[in-house]
Amino acid sequence: LDRIKQTLDKPREVLTLDKPHRLVTIPFDQIEYVEIVGKTLHFMLLNNGEESIKAPLRDYEEKLLDRPGFFKTHRSFIVNFTNMRELNSDTFISMSKRNVPIARGLRKEAKDAFVRFLFEDADRR
C-alpha cells in the first residue's frame, strides 16, 4: 500500500511542446515513440494518441534520451521501452500495436538495451 501511495503522490514528469499559440504537456510515461516525418515531429502516445509539432528531432532528442528507457532505434525514431510490448528481429511493437523499425546497424544494441532495461525495471519493483 505504501508503494501505491508513493506512486500516486509523485508528480508526473512531463515533456512540454511549444506549439503555435499554446504549450502542450505530455507525460513521459504516455509516450510510446517519437517519429520525424519531413519537418513534423510526431509523438505517438498510449491508446493511439498523437501530438505533432513542426520541429526537428534534435530539439527534443536530448530531453528524451537522457531519461531511462528511451532509445534511438533509427535516425527518425526514438522509443520508450516502457511502452513496447514486443521486440522482433528488426521491429519493436508498441502497446498500441504500432511497428517501430530498428536500423540494421542498431539491432544488437537495441536488443541488449531493451533486455537490460527489462531486468533493471524488474529489480526496481
Regions found by a protein language model. Give the residues of each.
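Inter-domain helical "communication" segments and dimerization helices
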Residues: 1-14, 101, 115-125
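DNA major-groove recognition helices of helix-turn-helix
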Residues: 60, 109-110
